[in-house]
Amino acid sequence: MQEKISKFEDFLTQLQQNITTALEQHETNAAKFISDKWQKPDTPDQKLKGYGNSMIIEGGEIFEKGVVAFSRVHGSELPPSATAKRQELAGKSFIATGLSLVIHPRNPFVPTSHANFRIFIAGADTDNPIWWFGGGFDLTPYYPFEEDAIHWHQTAKNICDKHDKTYYPKFKKWCDEYFYLKHRNEYRGVGGLFFDDLNDKSFDECFNFVTDCANSYLDAYIPIVAQRKNIEYSQKHKDFQLYRRGRYVEFNLVFDRGTIFGLQSGGRTESILSSMPPMATWKYNWQPELGSEEEKVYQYIKPRDWIK
C-alpha cells in the first residue's frame, strides 16, 4: 500500500507543477506562484504529522490570488469529520495525501475554480487497510456565460464516460448537493464533479479515474480563462464579485469537509485557509435589482442539466 500511496504522491506533485505553469502563462504581470514547503515536526504533541508544498500566487493582473497545495499527512486517529458517516473507522490511524486548489481571478467575468484530489487510507499499519479516493472540480461564476458552463460540464462528462457512464450523473448531482449553502438557500456555483468514498472498483481502476479527472481540470478551466480575462469591467462588477466571494468564505468555513478535517486534525492552518479570497464583502440584506445582470446569476447557479 505504501508503494501505491507514493505513486499517487508523485502524480500529484507533477500535477501541481503542470497546473501552476499553465496558469502562469496567462498572467500578464510579474506575479508567479511561490513555493512554500513545510513539514510538521515528528513530536508526541503533534496530532498530525507530515509534509507538503503550498504554491501561492498573489497580486496578479489575471489571478488576484490562487493556491495549489499538496500535502501528505498521517495521524494516529481519524478526526470526527472523517468518521461521522463511517463509525467503523473511529479510532483508526490514517494517511491522507491530496492536492487542493482554488483560483480567484481579478476580473469578475472570469469564474473562480476549485479542484481537489485525494486518497485516504485508514488503518494503513494493519493487515487490512481501508482506502478510498475523493475529489472533483467545480466552477463559481460571478457573471456567467452559458457556453462556459456547458464546456465545463462536457469536459467532466467526457472523462467520466471514459471510465463509467454512471459516474457523471451521480457525481454531478453529488456536486450540486455538496456545494449548497443551507443557511442562504443558495448554491455556490454551477457545479461540476464531486465524489468521496470512491472504492467501488479495483485500486488501479479508481486510481486511473481520479488521475484522468485531475488531468482534465486544465482542459476545463484554461479555455474559459483565455476567453474571459480581457473583458472590460466596471466597479459595479467588481463590487458584486466581492459580495459573492463572501458566500465562498461562508461555505469554506461552515461546510467544507476539507477545511473542517484539516482544523480538527491539527493541520497547517496557513495552508488550510490559503483558499480564502484576498478580498470579500458583506452587505446587510442586500438584494439585486430586478432584471439586472446580478439578479440573473441567482437563476443561473441553480442545478440544471447543462448537457442537452
Curated annotation (Swiss-Prot):
Pathway in which the depicted protein is active: Porphyrin-containing compound metabolism; protoporphyrin-IX biosynthesis; protoporphyrinogen-IX from coproporphyrinogen-III (O2 route): step 1/1
GO terms for MF: coproporphyrinogen oxidase activity; metal ion binding; protein homodimerization activity
Residues given in the record as substrate binding sites: S100, N116, F117, R118, G266, G267, R268
Binding site for a divalent metal cation: H104, H114, H153, H183
Cellular compartment(s): Cytoplasm
Residue segments, region Important for dimerization: 248-283
Marked site positions, Important for dimerization: H183
PROSITE patterns associated with the record: COPROGEN_OXIDASE
Reactions that this protein is recorded to catalyse: coproporphyrinogen III + O2 + 2 H(+) = protoporphyrinogen IX + 2 CO2 + 2 H2O
Assigned protein family: Belongs to the aerobic coproporphyrinogen-III oxidase family.
Name listed for the protein in its UniProt record: Oxygen-dependent coproporphyrinogen-III oxidase
Classification lineage: Bacteria, Pseudomonadati, Pseudomonadota, Gammaproteobacteria, Thiotrichales
